[in-house]
Amino acid sequence: PLQRPHPPIVVTAVAPFSKGIVEAAARGWDPISANFLLRKWVKTHWPKYVEGCERAGRPADPANWRVARSIFVADDMNTARDYVFDANSPYRFYYSQLLTKMKKHGRANLFKHDQNMHDDDVTLEMVMDECITWGTPDKVADDILALRDEVGDFGTLLVAGKDWADVALSRRSM
């Protein structure tokens, strides 16, 4: 960046054990872990960020790590489940498109807990179950705390936006 000091530069990390995070952190940039990664892969980003910060001689601060997730909140579980998993759901559309593209380009590994799993065994339902946080406010809060427990401390939770099939429900979710 030509401007000194420059605004914060934040890069998206989409791969498990991302080498891009190492390089970004070494340049003084900070990571966003993509919303479509399994938690086990999100967790691999912190050590890579630390590695890059150490290379640059700067402290690794969890406050600089952003984690993106797909989140939908409703007043009751049935409404949340229907909105997220319905055939016309923007969440289903997003993850269906993403899974189709990743499989086509040999990247279905992003959705696998076990890398020996066959690509055909990676289903849309499995990906949605793993990647979407949904439910009542209490359930979603508990799931976010569980995310933090699993992946470690991070600074900012980013909600990955989806199209609004129902404006009132989408606005309420925010």
Q: What does each model-found stretch correspond to?
A:
Residues 1, 40-151:
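An alpha-helical appendage that flanks or caps ligand/catalytic pockets
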Residues 1-27, 40-47, 54-55:
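Internal, glycine-rich beta/alpha segment that forms the wall or movable "lid"
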Residues 9-12, 29-34, 63-70, 155-159:
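Hydrophobic faces of well-ordered beta-strands that scaffold small-molecule active sites
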Residues 15, 37, 71-73, 163:
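Active-site-proximal loop/turn and secondary-structure-junction residues that shape catalytic pockets
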Residues 17, 42, 140, 170, ...:
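Aromatic/hydrophobic pocket-lining residues that form the small-molecule binding cavity
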Residues 23-31, 148-151:
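Catalytic domains of carbohydrate-active enzymes, especially glycoside hydrolases
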Residues 36-39, 158-169:
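Glycine-rich, proline-tolerant flexible connector loops at the mouths of alpha/beta enzymes
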Residues 76-79, 165-174:
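Short glycine/threonine-rich loop-to-helix capping motif typified by GTGT followed
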